[in-house]
Regions:
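Signature of N-terminal electron-transfer/Fe-S-associated modules in redox systems
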Residues: 1-202
Length: 202
């Protein structure tokens, strides 16, 4: 794993919004009183959602106090897991899976589309500052490869042309429909084969 460093530019303060605070308290109460520090990952996610898709150091310190947990322990969690962004990303944060199943099915064509429409390099903001992209490891939708995640939504069964159209919509302020772009429902077969024993259509 590459070394992950927090952004050099950091806000001085952070605190949960009313909605985030309610969500955090709800999660913490699900743990025994002596195990509530186990909620740290969920609270980091809440902080990231509130703060435009990235977690500043001030948020880590705030969560440490919230959970009565040493700041360094929160920092260790946030810097270890790659789903936590340690520097500003776009409002539309695009993650392209390039693990083996997606790679075999053309994931790097999706990367080409991101380079053309957003920025030449990963983790760079688009010209209008609204989007950024990066390659990631498996997102768990291998059967619908290649795919990418935009914020909380999955876009599956893609190729370069379809990806370019999705990115054009995002850049123009539209919200593209998530899901399969081959018309599949969830992960149903692409042909008429419905069982492993249906050898005629294999």
């Amino acid at each position: 794993m590459s070394l992950r460093r927090p952004s050099k530019e950091q806000p001085e303060n952070f605190e949960f919004s009313t909605a985030s605070l309610t969500a955090a308290k709800t999660i913490v109460t699900k743990y025994p009183k002596d195990k509530q520090q186990s909620a740290v990952m969920a609270l980091l996610y809440i902080a990231q959602k509130q703060n435009n898709n990235w977690i500043p150091l001030a948020a880590m310190k705030y969560i440490g106090k919230f959970l009565d947990m040493p700041y360094i322990k929160v920092y260790e969690v946030a810097t270890f897991y790659t789903m936590y962004n340690l520097a500003p990303v776009g409002k539309h944060f695009i993650q392209v899976c390039t693990t083996t199943p997606c790679m075999i099915r053309g994931a790097y064509k999706l990367v080409e589309a991101c380079k053309e429409k957003i920025s030449e390099n990963e983790n760079e903001l688009s010209k209008d500052k609204s989007c950024s992209w990066m390659e990631v490891e498996c997102l768990g939708a291998c059967v619908n490869a290649p795919m990418m995640q935009i914020n909380d939504n999955y876009y599956e069964d893609l190729d370069k042309e379809k990806t370019l159209k999705i990115l054009d919509k995002i850049l123009s302020g539209e919200t593209p429909k998530p899901g399969s772009y081959r018309g599949r429902i969830n992960n149903e077969p692409e042909n008429t084969r419905k069982t492993l024993m249906d050898l005629k259509n294999a």
